[in-house]
């Protein structure tokens, strides 16, 4: 049964990820990927902390939201590919700005989500 919940969550996460990818414009900054990863990091921290109370009696929903929805929404492989592409295009300044913003922003937003959600699990 958990596979069904992960599948459904993944379906919505993938659709949301696709919609966000339309924000990637020719500016060179993959805004859709940045937003997906930052929002996903925040929600993972928030929902993981909140899960002690909210998902206590619903572990299948937790699995569907965290592994399914957030797993499909966020993307490390696309992030890495975008960094390599920036390197190949000699966009070194953008590579560092995007890379550091994504990495540090993801950690900060995850931490902020944990703090808002309560005690970590």
UniProtKB/Swiss-Prot annotation:
The UniProt catalytic activity note for this protein reads: fluoride(in) = fluoride(out)
Write the record's keywords in alphabetical order, separated by commas.
Cell membrane, Ion channel, Ion transport, Membrane, Metal-binding, Sodium, Transmembrane, Transmembrane helix, Transport
* Biological process (GO), any one: cellular detoxification of fluoride
Q: Name one Pfam family in it.
A: CRCB
Q: InterPro entries, per this entry?
A: FluC
Protein location? Cell membrane
What the record says about activity regulation is: Na(+) is not transported, but it plays an essential structural role and its presence is essential for fluoride channel function.
Q: Which domain of life is it from?
A: Bacteria
Question: Binding residues for Na(+), per the UniProt record?
Answer: 71, 74
What is this entry's stated membrane topology?
Answer: Multi-pass membrane protein
Q: What Gene Ontology molecular function terms does this protein carry?
A: fluoride channel activity; metal ion binding
TM region positions: 3-23, 27-47, 64-84, 92-112
GO cellular component annotations of the record: plasma membrane
Q: Which NCBIfam families match?
A: PRK14201.1 (NF010797)
Family membership = Belongs to the fluoride channel Fluc/FEX (TC 1.A.43) family.
For this protein, the record's HAMAP family field holds: FluC
* Cited function: Fluoride-specific ion channel. Important for reducing fluoride concentration in the cell, thus reducing its toxicity.
Its recorded name reads Fluoride-specific ion channel FluC 2
Lineage per the UniProt record? Bacteria, Bacillati, Bacillota, Bacilli, Bacillales
